[in-house]
Regions:
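Acidic/polar loop patches that form or flank catalytic/metal-binding clefts of enzymes
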Residues: 30, 75, 288-291, 324-325, ...
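N-terminal export/assembly segments and adjacent metallocofactor-ligating motifs
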Residues: 1-285, 299, 311, 320-326, ...
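A generic structural motif
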Residues: 175-186, 243-246, 367-381, 438-451
Length: 751
């Protein structure tokens, strides 16, 4: 929609960016208040409120947010109605951001260790003392030409935040490792192979009439759930007279499976084989694009799919042959159709193959390309910075563990951490056993995490509501989107920006380090990227001079270019003639169940989210369980093992065990047990400590053969009764009367 003269005059009268044009925006009245608070006094009007735009950092999606501020205090977070990714919607994690800002257990000031590593015993110091200590150690290493003994571990980064860390590490000769959840690594590797792009593709569900999902819990936590939930709503109800069909393939009954028209409970690790069998039906019933057939088979043609006839693979995948044919025919005849894949489908030793085979179905039905439901995203004119995260593989983490343990090929004399908790996230590698051998550990933390408990120096880091930042949205909604994060409020504690501290260290050390990092602070680095957007003369915000443009992108919460598009259709990937078979750790006779770890909607995979009580209390949609870890089994498995809800069992794998209560999920198939990720922390404040167990600690370190990502669903387990029971905290069902000590139980009923 264009900007009318009346709209433009309103903007000029009410906005600090009077010479800005917002292209392609309807500009709701409410949004006239969304302006940068950088130069606005903290209390503009006592009792009045204002809304400021920024970027959510509670997951990697990068949704746009607006924050309600009254008298200098953030009161509420909502979705930015103008941001193209989420268009005003926000998930529970995004809403809980204010709890992170005002958390009572935040690291309030710099801390220096006084006790043994791991005991979390510290004393408070000033920033001057803390930075003197860190600067001196860094200067000594540079002076000894030992900068390559520095290791930096962060969470996933993009844009100028990633560029600052990359240049800092490059100038020192240090290693920079990004720690992400395993599924992010394998999805990126598979899409790079399937679509030839470093950016994740945009699955426009709202344009499809049929969606076939392989393990991707896109209505739960997969990749960009708010974007996909909006698309799903339009897919179901957004087109008069048209209601799309959803089929979900998953060994666990997830929220996406619960919403599907049909759920195929396949055997774990067989998703790629099922995709090839569907392809066989498409090819042999003339429902597939001939050119795509030739490309996918490297010229071998339709005969290459003959080994995957439904009758030949039915037992291996656990789906009857006729059901495979019915799904394939519906997928081929109900155009446009889209196949998406991720989550547990990629969590095996053949994970990349499973995902690529599923993505290949889109080529067979002509769904890839401009104007179709599977679209590539154009590169934004934002400079030579990392546009996508670069998560480290399991082998890289194993190499770091070995280096810490042996000191070869060189010791780790300085370990710097930000937004990463390897003690918790790499428990399957026993990372905490070797962490103590690092020379000096510095952790930039918002909440004291399990790794920070081992640190020699803990520096309080800003939350995303107190800091500057940028976000190269990935996946974007078919066109490039850059989100701009700005400080919404003044720092609540004595915290600082991790990136600003790196820049100040570079100035203090001097030499090549200072030359590589010319910016005085993160804000100026981001402004450099914004200048390139301004010079392009494209996109949603346009202005005569840069300062007006800068105010405009802050006011809108970002920049996007709806006219940018990738017109070329990528070359389909060549599929293997002999698909790899999923391998599992543990003998099936001794460990009869396949363990399926999954990411709950609230606390996700852990980290600071586990410390937020709102998210601990978010019910898992299918089970309604909260506040603890559980083992989810089906009724057949429960009957065979004599288990009932609330029985405490030991979940034992070949490498470890955890104890959790049982929940009997009527939708769970036999042969699998599902356990949520995200709990079992020893730190993270009062709301996370001692709640549940960390399922990562019992996983075997098997990896996907292609991407090197952790095959987190490749571990077999057994359930052993402990003879104890525990109350399962949930929202569903009746609550029987129970008594308290020294009190008489009273049952309240409706008379």
């Amino acid at each position: 929609m264009g900007v009318t003269r009346r709209d433009f005059m309103k903007i000029a009268a009410t906005s600090a960016a009077g010479a800005v044009v917002f292209a392609g925006c309807s500009i709701p009245e409410r949004e006239f208040q969304i302006q940068s608070p950088v130069r606005i006094p903290e209390d503009v009007l006592a009792g009045g409120d204002a809304w400021y735009a920024s970027v959510c950092r509670q997951c990697l999606a990068g949704c746009g947010i607006i924050v309600r501020v009254m008298e200098g205090r953030a009161k509420k977070i909502e979705g930015n109605p103008d941001h193209p990714l989420n268009r005003g919607k926000l998930c529970a994690r995004g809403l809980a951001g204010v709890q992170l800002l005002y958390h009572p257990d935040r690291v309030a000031r710099p801390l220096i260790r006084t006790g043994e590593r791991g005991r979390a015993e510290f004393r408070s110091v000033s920033w001057d003392e803390a930075l003197r200590e860190l600067t001196q150690r860094l200067q000594n290493l540079v002076g000894q030409q030992a900068g390559n003994t520095v290791v930096i571990i962060t969470g996933p980064l993009t844009g100028y935040r990633a560029e600052i860390v990359r240049r800092f590490a490059r100038a020192l000769g240090a290693d920079h490792l990004q720690l992400a959840t395993p599924d992010q690594t394998v999805v990126r590797a598979a899409q790079r192979r399937a679509f030839g792009s470093d950016f994740l593709v945009d699955f426009a569900l709202e344009q499809a009439n049929y969606v076939l999902s392989f393990g991707a819990d896109f209505l739960g936590t997969w990749v960009s759930p708010v974007r996909y939930s909006r698309g799903y709503g339009d897919f179901r109800q957004g087109r008069p007279g048209t209601r799309g069909t959803l089929v979900h393939v998953d060994p666990r009954f997830s929220i996406t499976a619960a919403n599907a028209d049909e759920w195929l409970a396949v055997k774990p690790g067989s998703e790629g084989l099922l995709a090839l069998s569907i392809a066989h039906v498409l090819v042999n019933e003339n429902l597939a694009n001939p050119a795509a057939i030739q490309a996918l088979t490297a010229g071998a043609g339709p005969a290459a799919f003959n080994p995957f006839r439904p009758e030949l693979v039915s037992d291996a995948v656990g789906v009857p042959p006729e059901r495979i044919r019915e799904v394939a025919r519906a997928f081929g005849r109900t155009r446009p159709a889209v196949a998406i894949a991720g989550g547990v489908a990629g969590a095996h030793t053949n994970g990349t193959f499973n995902l690529v085979a599923a993505y290949a179905l889109n080529y067979l039905v002509g769904s890839v390309g401009l104007g179709r439901p599977v679209r590539l995203v154009a590169r934004p004119p934002y400079g030579d910075v990392p546009y996508t995260p670069n998560p480290a593989t399991v082998s890289q983490w194993q190499a770091l563990s070995s280096r810490l343990d042996t000191g070869r090929p060189r010791p780790v004399q300085l370990l710097i951490l930000f937004d990463a908790d390897p003690v918790y996230q790499l428990q399957y590698l026993g990372f905490e056993k070797v962490l103590g051998k690092a020379g000096y550990i510095v952790s930039f933390s918002t909440l004291l995490d399990d790794t920070a408990a081992y640190a020699d120096l803990v520096l309080p880091a800003h939350t995303y509501l107190e800091d500057w930042g940028d976000e190269v949205t990935d996946p974007a909604p078919s066109y490039p989107v850059i989100g701009f994060q700005q400080p919404i409020v003044n720092p609540f504690y004595d915290s600082r920006s991790f990136f600003d501290v790196l820049l100040s260290l570079a100035r203090a050390v001097g030499g090549r380090l200072q030359a590589e990092l010319p910016w005085p602070n993160l804000r100026e680095a981001i402004r450099e990227g914004a200048r390139q957007l301004h010079r392009s003369g494209r996109g949603s915000v346009q202005a005569v001079d840069f300062e007006a443009f800068w105010n405009g992108v802050l006011q809108r919460g970002g920049w996007w270019d709806t006219a940018a598009a990738v017109e070329a259709v990528p070359t389909p990937p060549s599929l293997p003639a002999q698909p790899p078979v999923a391998r599992f750790q543990g003998d099936a006779r001794e460990y009869p169940l396949v363990l399926i770890p999954f990411e709950p909607i609230g606390v996700a995979s852990g980290g600071p989210l586990a410390g937020l009580p709102w998210l601990q209390a978010v019910p898992e949609p299918v089970t309604t369980l909260v506040w603890h870890t559980w083992a989810e089994v089906g009724p057949e498995t429960a009957r065979r093992l004599g288990l009932a809800e609330g029985d405490v069992v030991a979940v034992e794998s070949p490498v470890g065990r955890i104890e959790v209560p049982v929940y009997v999920n009527l939708g769970m198939p036999p042969g699998v047990v599902a356990v949520p990720l995200g709990r079992g922390q020893r730190q993270y404040g009062r709301y996370a400590q001692g709640r549940g167990a960390n399922v990562l600690g019992i996983l075997a370190p098997l990896t996907d053969e292609d991407s090197g990502a952790l095959a987190y669903a490749a571990t077999r387990v057994r359930l052993v009764r402990t003879g104890r029971r525990a109350r399962v905290v949930k929202f569903e069902g009746a609550v029987p009367p129970f008594g308290f000590e020294h009190e008489r139980p009273v049952q309240v009923t409706r008379g």
